């Protein structure tokens, strides 16, 4: 894609701090470094978001993520965990519209990276869960 910054990185038009590359993906340090070692994994093929993946591309990208995550973790004994995140759509904080997976090493719960999961379970009755479940399950019917 002509104006895509990640496509330009794949094509070598823009430099990156590449940690891993093969014929399917490229993994490079996120310029923001939310935590030290914050790495992006992108498919070399331009897909905007998760909704554009076919099963083959999804399998090829996802099977590489654990290997890259293990290398990041092994690179620093202070890494205690890792968040693996993918944002899809502007409302979900996607800022570059070439699908990418964030691998965020975690050093402690005080490392400035925060995710806020709010518990809304008190707002849902059994019937509400069932209605949501049914709506999603219906999408798998032929």
Predicted regions and their residues:
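HIT superfamily nucleotide-processing domains
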Residues: 1-142
């Amino acid at each position: 894609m002509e104006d895509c910054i990640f496509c330009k990185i794949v094509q070598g038009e823009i430099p990156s701090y590449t940690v891993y590359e093969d014929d399917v993906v490229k993994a490079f340090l996120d310029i923001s470094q939310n935590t030290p070692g914050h790495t992006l994994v992108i498919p070399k093929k331009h897909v905007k978001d998760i909704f554009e993946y076919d099963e083959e591309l999804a399998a090829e990208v996802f099977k590489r993520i654990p290997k890259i995550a293990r290398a990041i973790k092994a690179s620093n004994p202070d890494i205690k965990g890792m968040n693996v995140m993918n944002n899809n759509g502007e409302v979900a904080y996607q800022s570059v519209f070439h699908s990418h997976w964030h691998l965020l090493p975690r050093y402690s719960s005080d490392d400035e990276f925060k995710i806020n999961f709010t518990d809304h379970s008190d707002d849902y009755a059994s019937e509400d869960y069932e209605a949501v479940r049914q709506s999603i399950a219906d999408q798998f019917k032929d």
